[in-house]
């Protein structure tokens, strides 16, 4: 049976990751349900949770340069697309799967079809105390699943999280999906899956490479970058919604500058060609 893991944030080092996973997020829209004037000066952004560490750094630079504060909510791209379609007051949407942006554009909910800003990668991650040995072809994981020595493995929910879908594709590519399915623990998004793995709620997880590189995880475990051939490309697209303020427009443009792109690259994202 596929299960959903417990939310555990046992150290200060995982606090930021837990926040991105939704552990400390209040009621839906609580951080963005403010008056129109506030929205105009402090744009509300919905961002895929794999962006947590990279986007925090970019937004900090943007705020220093412009004086504009930004409110970012992290979560799964599929859930954000549904919320925007239902009227959530986000002004800029950074999706981990470009299809969600295209769907909103087709419904007239974005100003245009946006721009491709990054290509994501996935990695097999294991905390230091886990017996699992990460390798690019998932050979140790395969052996452990087949001999019954594997514990639970965390991935994001493939139903609405692009990184969960990529994890499923990778597991299918090596012929492991059917055998490992009963051992999976699903995160609401990839940050929560990473939290489960890093906190010891699972033996490991297939998570965003950008999260595996981040200090809270890198210091607590080890990982192997998986070949791109194991899954469909994670083409990450962003677009301004029809609610976009001038501040959101400025952030959208800032994200396409060389300095912002360099930060994305340093955090493990491949950059699309201009």
What are these regions (language model features)?
Residues 8-9, 13, 166:
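Intrinsically disordered, metal-sensing/regulatory segments
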Residues 1-7:
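N-terminal secretory signal peptides that target proteins for export/translocation
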Residues 29-78, 82-88, 95-98, 102-110, ...:
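Exported/periplasmic ABC-transporter solute-binding proteins
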């Amino acid at each position: 049976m596929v299960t959903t893991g417990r939310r555990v944030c046992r150290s200060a080092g995982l606090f930021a990751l837990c926040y991105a996973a939704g552990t400390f997020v209040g009621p839906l829209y609580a951080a963005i349900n403010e008056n129109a004037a506030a929205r105009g000066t402090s744009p509300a952004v919905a961002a895929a949770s794999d962006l947590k560490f990279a986007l925090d750094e970019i937004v900090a630079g943007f705020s220093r340069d412009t004086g504009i504060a930004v409110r970012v909510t992290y979560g799964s791209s599929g859930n954000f697309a549904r919320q925007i379609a239902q009227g959530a007051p986000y002004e800029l949407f950074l999706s981990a799967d470009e299809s969600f942006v295209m769907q909103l554009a087709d419904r007239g909910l974005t100003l245009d079809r946006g721009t491709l800003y990054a290509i994501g990668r996935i990695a097999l991650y294991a905390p230091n105390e886990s017996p699992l040995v990460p390798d690019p072809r998932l050979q140790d994981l395969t052996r452990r699943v087949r001999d019954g020595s594997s514990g639970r493995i965390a991935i994001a929910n493939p139903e609405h999280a692009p990184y969960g879908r990529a994890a499923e594709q990778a597991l299918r590519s090596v012929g492991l999906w059917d055998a490992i399915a009963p051992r999976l623990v699903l995160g609401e998004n990839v940050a929560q899956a990473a939290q489960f793995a890093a906190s010891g709620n699972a033996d490991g997880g297939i998570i965003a490479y950008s999260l595996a590189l981040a200090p809270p995880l890198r210091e607590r475990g080890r990982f192997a970058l998986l070949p791109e051939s194991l899954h469909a490309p994670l083409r990450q697209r962003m677009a301004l919604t029809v609610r976009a303020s001038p501040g959101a427009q400025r952030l959208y443009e800032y994200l396409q500058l060389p300095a912002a792109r360099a930060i994305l690259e340093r955090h493990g994202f491949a950059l699309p060609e201009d």
